[in-house]
Amino acid sequence: MSDTAVADTRRLNSKPQDLTDAYGPPSNFLEIDIFNPQTVGVGRARFTTYEVRMRTNLPIFKLKESCVRRRYSDFEWLKNELERDSKIVVPPLPGKALKRQLPFRGDEGIFEESFIEERRQGLEQFINKIAGHPLAQNERCLHMFLQEEAIDRNYVPGKVRQ
C-alpha cells in the first residue's frame, strides 16, 4: 500500500465512534408516513382520507412533529402548486382509477381495501420524494400541506425563510 493510501485510511479512523454516535438520532432527518385510511360520507360525497405524519429535525420546518388528515384531492393540489411555482420536477401521483369509479360495479371500486392500500403506498412514495428535495422544502405550499390542519387554497405562494 502506498504512503498516501495509509495516511488517508488513518485520517478516517481519527475519532472512535461511541454508542451515542452509533445509536443517536441522525444529524438531519425527515420522516413522513401515510397511514390510517378512513372512508367518510355516503354516495357521491364519499371519499377516503389518510393521516399524514411528519417527524423532522430540519430547521426549515416550524413544527418538529405534525399529523394532519388529507384526501387525494389535497395531494393533487400540492402537485399543481409545486409544478406551477417551483423549479423541481414533481413525480406523478398514483392514478385516478377512473374505471373503478364507474357505476354498477360488482366491487367497492375506489373504496375497496386493496385499492386504498395501493393508493396509500403511492401517496407515501410521492410525498417522501417531494419532501426529500431540498428546493421543495422551502416551498410554503409543502409546509402548509404537512403542518396545517386546513389548507388555505388562497395562500400567497412563496418560499419559507428559516
Curated annotation (Swiss-Prot):
Q: Does the keyword Acetylation apply?
A: yes
Q: SUPFAM superfamilies attached here? A: PX domain
Residues recorded as binding a 1,2-diacyl-sn-glycero-3-phospho-(1D-myo-inositol-3-phosphate), renumbered to this chain, are: R71, S73, K96, R119
One of the GO BP terms on file: negative regulation of early endosome to late endosome transport
Q: Which GO cellular component term is one of those annotated?
A: early endosome membrane
Entry-annotated residues carrying Phosphotyrosine: Y23
Which residues are annotated with the PTM N-acetylserine?
S2
Q: Give GO MF terms, alphabetically.
A: enzyme binding; phosphatidylinositol binding; phosphatidylinositol-3-phosphate binding
**Which PANTHER family does the entry mention?**
RE52028P (PTHR45963), SORTING NEXIN-12 (PTHR45963:SF3)
UniProt comment concerning the protein's domains: The PX domain mediates interaction with membranes enriched in phosphatidylinositol 3-phosphate.
Role of this protein: May be involved in several stages of intracellular trafficking.
Q: Which family does it belong to?
A: Belongs to the sorting nexin family.
What is the protein named?
Sorting nexin-12
Tell me the organism: Homo sapiens
- State the gene name recorded for this protein: SNX12
